[in-house]
């Protein structure tokens, strides 16, 4: 059986339909990326009026900067905490839906609410709750003799931004995990239950392998989220402190480019971060899409 391929009457119509997206891509992605690559090879004055080609000197200076290396490892640590915690917590809440008999719709709606909150608003919300002097959570912590002050304790500051970032991303992960779990044929679960397999073993032996593609997809998405979209949380909650302990790569780019006016160094850092994101994207399409197989 042959199928005819639809043909546009005007050969310009397909190009006209994709033109808006192409224009947006060029203006907001390709052009800024090209500008960053160009400035990363220049020595630029603080106002961007004059520049001099210096080749890879900015990158060499970058990797000899101890503060940049520290921010790199901070980003790795922060991204790992956010990604692993976010995926595990979201998967746990998605798996609980099966065991909630009453109020499941309310539970699902409640899980989706954080996604509607802006990242900066989420940070401010948890700042109020963790306020050293008047916060509700810090009040209960003080009852147990624990002194909380994230403005002076780098470990507490890291916990705060990780907690707020994970809370903000739970809804997104929950939605995908819930859809993936619901797509599993019930006959497999029921057959395993009849054979005497317990719920925990059913989850790890049946459900978890079947949702592996979604899990790997969310792994890449959450890593990119931790690299980029957590900037408002870090800025509103800690401003990268204390003592630059929460200064990630994206926040260091902002601080040096917009506050320190070091455009060349900021551009070089942007190129490095762009390279990392490209690597993550390649991993997604080359590994996630091709290596995950059902047996």
Swiss-Prot record:
Gene3D superfamilies: MetI-like (1.10.3720.10). Residues 76-284 form the ABC transmembrane type-1 domain. Residues 1-11, 102-109, 178-207, 284-295 are cytoplasmic. NCBIfam families: PRK10561.1. The complex is composed of two ATP-binding proteins (UgpC), two transmembrane proteins (UgpA and UgpE) and a solute-binding protein (UgpB). Part of the ABC transporter complex UgpBAEC involved in sn-glycerol-3-phosphate (G3P) import. Probably responsible for the translocation of the substrate across the membrane. Belongs to the binding-protein-dependent transport system permease family. UgpAE subfamily. This is sn-glycerol-3-phosphate transport system permease protein UgpA.
């Amino acid at each position: 059986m042959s199928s005819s391929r639809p043909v546009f009457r005007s050969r310009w119509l397909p190009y006209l339909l994709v033109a808006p997206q192409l224009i947006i891509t060029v203006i907001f992605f390709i052009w800024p990326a090209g500008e960053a690559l160009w400035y990363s090879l220049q020595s630029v004055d603080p106002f961007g009026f004059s520049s001099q080609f210096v080749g890879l000197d900015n990158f060499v200076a970058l990797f000899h900067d101890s503060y940049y290396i520290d921010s790199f490892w901070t980003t790795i640590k922060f991204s790992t905490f956010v990604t692993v915690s976010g995926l595990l917590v979201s998967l746990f809440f998605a798996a609980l839906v099966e065991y909630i008999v009453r109020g499941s719709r309310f539970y699902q709606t409640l899980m989706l609410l954080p996604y509607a909150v802006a990242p900066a608003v989420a940070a401010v919300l948890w700042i109020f709750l963790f306020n050293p002097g008047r916060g509700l959570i810090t009040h209960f912590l003080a009852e147990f003799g624990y002194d909380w002050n994230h403005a002076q304790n780098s470990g507490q500051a890291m916990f705060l931004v990780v907690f707020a970032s994970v809370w903000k991303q739970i809804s997104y992960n929950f939605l995908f995990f819930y859809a993936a779990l619901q797509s599993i044929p019930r006959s497999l679960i029921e057959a395993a239950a009849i054979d005497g397999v317990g719920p925990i073993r059913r989850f790890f032996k049946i459900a978890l392998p079947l949702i592996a593609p979604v899990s790997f997809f969310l792994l890449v998405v959450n890593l990119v989220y931790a690299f980029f979209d957590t900037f408002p949380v870090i800025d509103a909650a800690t401003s990268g402190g204390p003592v630059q302990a929460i200064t990630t790569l994206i926040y260091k780019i902002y601080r040096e480019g917009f506050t320190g006016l070091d455009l060349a160094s900021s551009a070089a850092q942007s190129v490095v971060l762009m390279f990392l994101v490209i690597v993550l994207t390649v991993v997604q399409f080359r590994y996630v899409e091709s290596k995950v197989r059902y047996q």
